[in-house]
């Protein structure tokens, strides 16, 4: 997993319910915790674009519901700044279900994906139809 070039604000708290935008059968997932999050004692973990999270499937097909999986944040509403000075924000918050290596479990991703995610997880970048 590569480092991020941008300083991404962590806008998604643990407990946030977010749309899943791949074709795995999950529709809404809830963030349980954030992988490699280093915070202060008793602070709730937060996630931003490109962070891998442990999630629980809240809505979706009966086979997918109540499963605990890994997912990567591909879009967030909170604006962030790229090194070239461009400010980027999306219309919604979205995640893609992956495995430990960051390879997506689905074969299709709906909507755009941030360029930072495509750089950090190349397999998500190849699966995405639009990279912003």
Swiss-Prot record:
Protein name (database record): Large ribosomal subunit protein uL14
Source organism of the structure: Methanosarcina acetivorans (strain ATCC 35395 / DSM 2834 / JCM 12185 / C2A)
Subunit and partners: Part of the 50S ribosomal subunit. Forms a cluster with proteins L3 and L24e, part of which may contact the 16S rRNA in 2 intersubunit bridges.
One matching Pfam family: Ribosomal_L14
Gene responsible for this protein: rpl14
Gene Ontology biological-process annotations: translation
Phylogenetic placement of the source organism: Archaea, Methanobacteriati, Methanobacteriota, Stenosarchaea group, Methanomicrobia
Domain of life assignment: Archaea
InterPro entries: Ribosomal_uL14 (IPR000218), Ribosomal_uL14_arc (IPR019971), Ribosomal_uL14_CS (IPR019972), Ribosomal_uL14_sf (IPR036853)
Gene Ontology molecular-function annotations: large ribosomal subunit rRNA binding; structural constituent of ribosome
GO cellular component labels: cytosolic large ribosomal subunit
Keyword annotations of the record: Ribonucleoprotein, Ribosomal protein, RNA-binding, rRNA-binding
Its biological purpose: Binds to 23S rRNA. Forms part of two intersubunit bridges in the 70S ribosome.
Family note: Belongs to the universal ribosomal protein uL14 family.
């Amino acid at each position: 997993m590569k480092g991020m070039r941008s300083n991404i604000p962590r806008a998604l708290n643990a407990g946030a319910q977010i749309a899943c935008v791949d074709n795995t059968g999950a529709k809404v997932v809830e963030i349980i915790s954030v992988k490699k999050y280093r915070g202060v004692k008793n602070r709730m973990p937060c996630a931003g674009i490109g962070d891998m999270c442990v999630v629980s499937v809240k809505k979706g097909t009966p086979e997918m519901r109540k499963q605990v999986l890994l997912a990567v944040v591909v879009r967030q509403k909170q604006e962030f700044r790229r090194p070239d000075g461009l400010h980027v924000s999306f219309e919604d918050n979205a995640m893609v279900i992956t495995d430990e290596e960051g390879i997506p479990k689905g074969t299709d991703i709906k909507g755009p994906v941030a360029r930072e995610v495509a750089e950090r997880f190349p397999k998500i970048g190849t699966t995405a139809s639009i990279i912003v």
